[in-house]
């Protein structure tokens, strides 16, 4: 059920980083209907309606686990963080990775596992929702391209999200699904992080839908959020504009994972 949003304040700081520009040389994706799932270092293409999946690449980044992936609507590439190298990478349609930037631990922490793009081409990544970083990936060759232009911390209301997704029609937010309820107890909470306010809100709460967390989420620009459960592979569909979630399909069981898709493909 939809309840009144709960808000808290967040702290922010701004930083600048000098990073070499890296021009795309590998083929982009095509804004197709699929979700893209990264698990450790392997990339999969997932049919969210049927749960069927196939491997795109088995080794995306050398000697790293990739997480916090997002789909850039401006250039149709996937981007993510290669841990523990703290590299921002661009991933082609063939699963080939190119390093765009390398961050220090002081800039981004030890690792990251949530990530997605806003509509303007900024990449937002962090760890569990308690930290956030905004990277400029709008225009290759610009002075700030590939750099962290803002960062900060946020109170995730005693919960945590394992992935987040931007759905333009639903406003300036990143959306995620948390296990548990604000204040304690068992259940599932639909949450959103304000890109303008830098605050978390608990938007709706539901019973326990599946055991464990939802490590990969995907969006459609009609208000639909697909969340893949790690433990059993169930893919649940949430309407962030209101309504009850439903089981959409059964996909792969997964861990050390993250998801992304072209939110502008309406999955006809």
Language model features with spans:
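Repeated scaffold domains used in trafficking and secretory/extracellular systems
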Residues: 23-28, 63-74, 105-120, 154-169, ...
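Conserved beta-propeller blade signature
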Residues: 34-38, 77-80, 122-126, 173-176, ...
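Extracellular mucin-like PTS domains
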Residues: 5-21
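Blade-level signature of beta-propeller repeat domains, shared across WD40, Kelch, NHL, RCC1
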Residues: 228-268
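An edge-strand/N-cap motif at the start of beta-rich repeat modules
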Residues: 20-56
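A short beta-strand motif characteristic of beta-propeller blades
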Residues: 52-60, 97-105, 144-155, 199-208, ...
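Structural motif
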Residues: 40-47, 85-92, 122, 129-136, ...
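Short loop/turn segments that connect beta-strands within beta-propeller blades
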Residues: 48-51, 91-96, 136-142, 194-198, ...
